[in-house]
């Protein structure tokens, strides 16, 4: 599995601001979107382009345009929605597919409860977005769902990842790519990433 920890100074600076304990909902939401945008920039660096001739202000001009697979952005509900706007700033024509996952309280296994995928997803590259990759359960379940629907070109974008989640994801789906702003130390006894960001969903939606 290709694993990319984006070390750009802007990414590190913005993520550092997100770690502040007393950060406002507005600021956290803005930064989640901004870092999501920067991760998208990195994740799409290998997109193929082709030469196209267009009508420029002074006549025909040859330009580069992206070719190949189109993109679908896949936010995992609910926290993934906080990164979606930033992703779409870079790929505004991308279609949106939505997946909802919850954890069964008895088995602790992830259970899909909602999915709305674009109709031609097998022809698209999926950018799956979720702020945190902790145990990896929700992400693995989402990718299982996407592959079952015929999508096999998949890149994962997360703000923070735990080594435990990375290992689980690599074991389940070694063919995908992971882009993260930080690989943190690991999980605590409650399953939170340390130092992490706390509950990203609560901070994005103001429900903490």
Curated annotation (Swiss-Prot):
EC number per UniProt: 2.4.2.9
Activity control summary: Allosterically activated by GTP.
Xref: InterPro entries: PRibTrfase_dom, PRTase-like, Upp_B, UPRTase/APRTase, Ura_phspho_trans
Catalytic activity: UMP + diphosphate = 5-phospho-alpha-D-ribose 1-diphosphate + uracil
Keyword entries, A-Z: Allosteric enzyme, Glycosyltransferase, GTP-binding, Magnesium, Nucleotide-binding, Transferase
GO molecular function: GTP binding; magnesium ion binding; uracil phosphoribosyltransferase activity
Any Pfam family hit: UPRTase
GO terms of biological process kind: UMP salvage; uracil salvage
Lipid biosynthesis in keyword set: no
Annotated residues for binding of uracil: 193, 198-200
Keyword Transferase: yes
Record-linked CDD domains: PRTases_typeI (cd06223)
Protein task: Catalyzes the conversion of uracil and 5-phospho-alpha-D-ribose 1-diphosphate (PRPP) to UMP and diphosphate.
HAMAP family: Upp_B
Protein family (similarity comment): Belongs to the UPRTase family.
Protein name: Uracil phosphoribosyltransferase
């Amino acid at each position: 599995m290709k694993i990319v920890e984006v070390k750009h100074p802007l990414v590190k600076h913005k993520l550092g601001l997100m770690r502040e304990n007393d950060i406002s909902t507005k600021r956290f939401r803005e930064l989640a979107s901004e870092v999501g945008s920067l991760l998208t920039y990195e994740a799409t660096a290998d997109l193929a382009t082709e030469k196209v001739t267009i009508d420029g202000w002074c006549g025909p001009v040859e330009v580069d345009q992206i070719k190949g697979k189109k993109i679908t952005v896949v936010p995992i509900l609910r926290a993934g929605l906080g990164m979606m706007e930033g992703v779409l700033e870079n790929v505004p024509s991308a279609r949106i597919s939505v997946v909802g996952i919850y954890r069964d309280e008895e088995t602790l296994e992830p259970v899909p409860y909602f999915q709305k995928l674009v109709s031609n997803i097998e022809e698209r590259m999926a950018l799956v977005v979720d702020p945190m990759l902790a145990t990896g359960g929700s992400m693995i379940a989402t990718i299982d769902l996407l592959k079952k629907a015929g999508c096999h070109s998949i890149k994962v974008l997360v703000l923070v990842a735990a080594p435990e989640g990375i290992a689980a994801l690599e074991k389940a789906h070694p063919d995908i790519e992971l882009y993260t702003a930080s690989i943190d130390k690991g999980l605590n006894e409650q399953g939170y990433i340390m130092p992490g960001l706390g509950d990203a969903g609560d901070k994005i939606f103001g429900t903490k």
